[in-house]
A protein has these predicted regions:
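Short acidic alpha-helix that forms the nucleotide-activated donor recognition element
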Residues: 70-73, 226-237, 257
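Short hydrophobic beta-strand element within catalytic cores of glycosyltransferases
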Residues: 261-265
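Acidic donor-binding loop of glycosyltransferase active sites
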Residues: 235-247, 260
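Conserved acidic donor-binding segment of nucleotide-sugar-dependent glycosyltransferases
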Residues: 278-286, 295-300
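A short, active-site helix/loop in glycosyltransferases that binds the activated sugar's phosphate group
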Residues: 88-89, 109, 125-147
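Conserved catalytic-core segment of nucleotide-activated headgroup transferases in glycan assembly
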Residues: 19, 139-220, 224-227
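Membrane-proximal helix-turn-helix segments that form the acceptor-binding/catalytic region
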Residues: 67-70, 112-129
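A charged, aromatic-enriched C-terminal amphipathic alpha-helix characteristic of glycosyltransferases
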Residues: 298-358
Length: 404
């Protein structure tokens, strides 16, 4: 069988590209021929350059590389992988079957307008969706009436696992990618700022981007790190904060495999794939996210329970398990099997963590742990940071400083 994939240009550290090449390698291991057509953004000059980039960024893939979208030849299946590649696949006449490898609801990457609606239109081209996770399949079924297949969020257990020799710290790690709006870096940083004021001893680790940003509290920015270093980080920290406001990220599942409790947002996209036993979902206000993080930091027994439940949930969700699901989905398309979609139910059934963000003139002194930050230092920080929300948490701090 001969398969072609149409891919957007590479982004270093891109989990989406890593997932695509992992599944291309899955088909190669089953004897498929795979051609990969990659958007020409000027960074590569030849197919050989593309191969070297893949080896450097994602670990390598023995497919046949093509620079640009000039597709030629006949294929048993042609895959679109991003909204602007879907039209290329739709219009190509020499593919027996056409599929859509969907990892995100990409319309959400754009403000409402042309970009949003054109991305939505890509789901109307009659391509057969194979999605990562259940939420996207649910969305394709219910909103686009498109029979869809999915494979689960899995983790590489050779990389992500508990390490007993790593010393635990009272620390939070946050996937900080300000170049990706769906990662909500502003909300995440504001939530971490609240935690840092209330628990100044808690360490904050940022990772996932080499952009430093203008962050007013003490932290360590690790930049783009290897997946092995990610696992060490997850083993070192008390809780991980990973925000994805579109499709779920693979990162929370990798954190769970490593035994790290996870906090993410209580949004519809997270309710179909994330278990309420291993993940805590918070309302999208910074105060609510901060409260969810503090609940785990302040209660070791809760952290231990989440860690155990997360590891148990990921126990059988190895990469090989996901590959087998993906391979069966491709095989169904090749043999023209009818895709019958049963209703997909939510698996996260706990309520969201919601903090009170209403400004009040009077706050009980015992509402939050008394601060240990020196008065002068905290006052200076508050004066110079004009972007802080005067929320209940920060008003509490201010009242404590004034002695109210």
């Amino acid at each position: 069988m001969k398969v072609a994939w149409v891919l957007p240009s590479f982004i270093e550290g891109s989990g989406g590209h890593r997932t695509m090449f992992q599944n291309i390698n899955c088909l190669l291991s089953h004897g498929y021929e795979c051609d990969v057509y990659i958007e020409d953004n000027g960074d590569a000059k030849s197919a050989d350059d593309l191969k070297k980039q893949v080896e450097r960024f994602f670990g390598g893939c023995n497919c046949t590389y093509h620079l640009g979208f000039q597709i030629s030849g006949e294929y048993d299946i042609l895959f679109a992988t991003a909204w602007f590649t879907a039209k290329v696949v739709r219009d190509y006449p020499f593919a027996k079957r056409k599929a859509y490898f969907i990892q995100d609801f990409e319309a959400l990457f754009n403000p409402m307008g042309d970009g949003y609606l054109l991305a939505c239109t890509s789901y109307c081209y009659g391509l057969s969706p194979i999605t990562i996770g259940k939420w996207l399949t649910h969305k394709m079924q219910t909103e686009y009436l498109s029979p869809s297949q999915y494979f689960d969020f899995c983790a590489d257990h050779n990389v992500y696992h508990p390490i007993n020799s790593v010393q635990k710290e009272e620390a939070i790690c946050f996937i900080y990618q300000p170049d990706k709006p769906r990662r909500c870096s502003i909300i995440g940083i504001e939530a971490l700022g609240i935690v840092k004021y209330l628990r100044p001893h808690v360490k904050i680790y940022l990772y996932g981007s080499n952009v430093s940003g203008h962050i007013w509290f003490d932290h360590t920015n690790l930049g783009i790190i290897s997946i092995e270093d990610c696992n060490t980080l997850y083993n070192k920290c008390t809780v991980g904060l990973c925000i994805s406001s579109s499709n779920p990220s693979r990162i929370p599942f990798e954190m769970m495999a490593a035994g790290l409790p996870v906090v993410d947002l209580y949004l519809d996209n997270n309710l179909y794939d994330m278990p309420d036993s291993g993940v805590v979902l918070a309302h999208y206000t910074p105060e609510s996210i901060a409260q969810a993080l503090l609940d785990i930091i302040d209660h070791p027994e809760k952290a231990a329970s989440l860690s155990q439940a997360g590891r148990e949930y990921m126990k059988y969700r190895t990469l090989e398990y996901g590959y087998e699901q993906f391979y069966r989905a491709v095989d169904n398309l090749l043999h023209d099997r009818t895709i019958v979609n049963a209703p997909i139910e939510k698996i996260y059934n706990s309520p969201p963590v919601i903090a009170d963000v209403i400004v009040q003139n009077s706050i009980k002194a015992d509402s939050y742990q008394r601060l240990t930050i020196p008065r002068k230092r905290l006052v200076d920080i508050l004066k110079h940071n004009r972007n802080l929300r005067k929320s209940r948490l920060l008003r509490t701090i201010w009242n404590l400083i004034k002695g109210n």
